């Protein structure tokens, strides 16, 4: 089969189309013919960062091929002997083996049955693939952690991005008042998602205008800020939140001092949110499937590439300015 192999850590050009063996499934896995693949900023981070490759991809050192990616939608073509959930021909999607080796940049993948769900018939493979890691992250941030409810005032940074555009839609689904923050070029797009207000981060500081938000979903990607300090965007976000509010960080890891200070000064709860394996993963992705099927959330696809153009897709995703999702089709 064809797959995109990472030849060495570095630039997008190190992602090479190659012939590799078809994966062999375990008893609890299904073989999926991949119809669509979604990529995320973390993909580019892992591609160019040895430590991230070792931690997030769980590099062992004896891999015949390093194949990145975690988000797919496709058709089940073979089932393991212990599989009871799926049968050949089922259309499925999911974010699987994260953290670990999903090897999703390929024509076929071997995936654990417990990390996939049935794709709704009225949802395309491309839209379903997009709504995996990104939509799950938005769900984890707003629903699981922040417990979003009707009339909550929510600020969503990065509202035009992969996670952000789902976050706006999920927040509106629950009846929240949404303030979207993104580049001014994307104002119409963000308001079109349902946001009630918009701020252009290039010309406006949200903290100069708002100090009573119930929830802030902060997805500003600053790789230098591994831990939060008073100089980070995360610290600025605290200024927009009312006493007793919630700060959900998607990228920056807030250190304990930052967390304790926010709690002591304004009773603000701060947490780093991600979609690493957890007990509610299956229910969460089922909820996403239901929202997709009902049209409550939609995947905006800004770029659609053939698998062979993975390097081009990475060039775009690593700018962190992509609108909505980037999808590839084998």
Q: Where do the protein language model's features map onto the residues?
A:
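A glycine-/small-residue-rich N-terminal strand-loop-strand element
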Residues: 71-98
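C-terminal hydrophobic helical "lid"/dimerization subdomain
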Residues: 280-330
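N-terminal glycine-rich beta->alpha transition that marks the start or flank
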Residues: 11-13, 20-73
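Mid-domain Rossmann-like dinucleotide-binding core that forms the NAD(H)/NADP(H) cofactor-binding site
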Residues: 129-200
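Glycine-rich phosphate-binding loop and adjacent beta-alpha segment
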Residues: 224-296, 330
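A short acidic, Gly/Pro-enriched loop at the edge of an enzyme's catalytic core
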Residues: 208-215
């Amino acid at each position: 089969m064809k797959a995109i192999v990472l030849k060495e850590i570095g630039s997008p050009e190190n992602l090479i189309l190659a012939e590799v063996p078809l994966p062999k499934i375990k008893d609890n896995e299904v073989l999926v013919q991949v119809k669509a693949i979604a990529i995320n900023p973390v993909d580019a981070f892992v591609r160019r960062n040895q430590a991230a490759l070792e931690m997030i991809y769980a590099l062992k050192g004896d891999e015949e091929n390093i194949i990145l990616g975690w988000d797919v939608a496709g058709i089940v073509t073979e089932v393991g002997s212990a599989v009871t959930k799926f049968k050949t021909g089922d259309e499925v999607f999911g974010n699987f083996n994260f953290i670990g080796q999903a090897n999703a940049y390929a024509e076929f993948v071997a995936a654990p049955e417990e990390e996939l769900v049935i794709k709704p018939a009225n949802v395309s493979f491309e839209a379903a693939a997009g709504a995996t890691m990104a939509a799950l992250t938005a769900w984890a941030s707003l629903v699981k952690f922040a417990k979003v409810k009707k009339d909550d005032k929510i600020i969503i940074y990065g509202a035009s991005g992969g996670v952000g555009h789902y976050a706006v839609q999920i927040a509106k689904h629950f009846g929240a008042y949404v303030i979207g923050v993104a580049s001014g070029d994307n104002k119409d797009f963000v308001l079109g998602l349902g946001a009630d207000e918009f701020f252009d981060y290039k010309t406006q500081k949200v903290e100069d205008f708002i100090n009573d938000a119930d929830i802030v979903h902060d997805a500003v990607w600053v790789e230098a800020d591994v831990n939060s300090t008073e100089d980070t965007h995360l610290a600025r976000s605290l200024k927009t939140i009312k006493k007793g509010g919630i700060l959900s960080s998607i990228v920056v890891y807030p250190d304990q001092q930052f967390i304790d200070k926010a709690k002591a000064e304004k009773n603000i709860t701060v947490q780093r949110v991600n979609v690493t394996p957890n007990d509610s993963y299956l229910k969460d992705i089922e909820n996403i499937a239901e929202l997709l099927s009902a049209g409550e959330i939609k995947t905006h696809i800004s770029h659609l590439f053939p698998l062979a153009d993975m390097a081009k897709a990475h060039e775009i995703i690593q700018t962190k300015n992509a609108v909505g999702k980037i999808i590839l089709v084998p």
